[in-house]
Amino acid sequence: MAKVVTMGEIMLRLSPPGYQRFAQASEFEINYGGAEANVAVSLAQLGHDVTYISKIPSNAIGEAAIATLKKTGVDCRDIARAVRQSDKENGASVRPSSVVYDRADSSITQASAEEFDFDQIFDGAELFHVSGITPVLSEETARLTRIALQKAKEHGVTTSFDLNYRTKLWTEDITGKQKLLSDLMSYVDICFGNTRDAAKCLGYAEKDKNFIDGDYSICVDEKHMENVRERYGFT
C-alpha cells in the first residue's frame, strides 16, 4: 500500500438533530471533518499509510479531533498545535441544507510552513493531496500550500489537487484567488474538478454556452476538462 500525505483544515461541525433549524435546536450533533481529512480517513481505511498535516489549537477539542483521526489509522504526529467549526443544518423536503462557516482566524490560517518538516514528511511518500480550499483561506495558507507542493515535487512525490470550489469561501478578491490557484497548478500532477470548478477556481472558460451556463453532461465535462489538462500539463 502507498504512503500518502494530505494537508488541510479539520473542523468541528455542529448539526441540529434531525431536520431542525439552528434557531429551533437546543442541542447539536458533533462531527469532525474537512475535505483533506476525509480523504485521509478514507485512504487509511483502505489500508494505506496516511499522514495528515494541519494545525489545531492546543485544547481538548483539538485533541478530540486528533483522536477521531487516529481511530481510523491516520498518522497525526505532524499536526502542529496552536478545529475551527462549520455548522450544518440538514435540509427537509424542499428546504436545502444550510452551512455556516466560522473559519476566520482559525489555527491553520496562521500556520507557517516552517512549522512542518517537509523533508521528513515526504520521505518515502508516494502521493501528496491538498484541495483548493486551503490556499485561499489566508496569505499564510497560500504560502504553506505552495511550499508543501514544491517540497513534494523535490522529493519526487506525485501531487494531487482537488479544486473543490466553495461559494462561501470565494466572496472576496476572486481574481487574486484564481491567479493563486492557477500558479499552483504548475506543481500539480493530478487535478480533480469539473467545468464549474475550472471556471470558478482557475478563471478558465471557453466561449461555449453549455460551459458557461453549467451544463455538466459527461461529454461537455470531458471536452473542456481535457483542454484544461492540456493547458496545465496534468498527468
Feature names for model-found ranges:
Residues M1-R21:
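Positively charged, low-complexity intrinsically disordered leader regions
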Residues N38-D49:
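Alpha-helix C-terminal capping segments
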Residues D49-G132:
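Conserved N-terminal subdomain of the carbohydrate kinase-like
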Residues K151-T158, E230-T235:
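A short helix->loop->beta-strand "cap" motif at the edges of active sites that frequently abuts
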Residues L169-T235:
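Conserved phosphate/ATP/ADP-binding segment of small-molecule kinases
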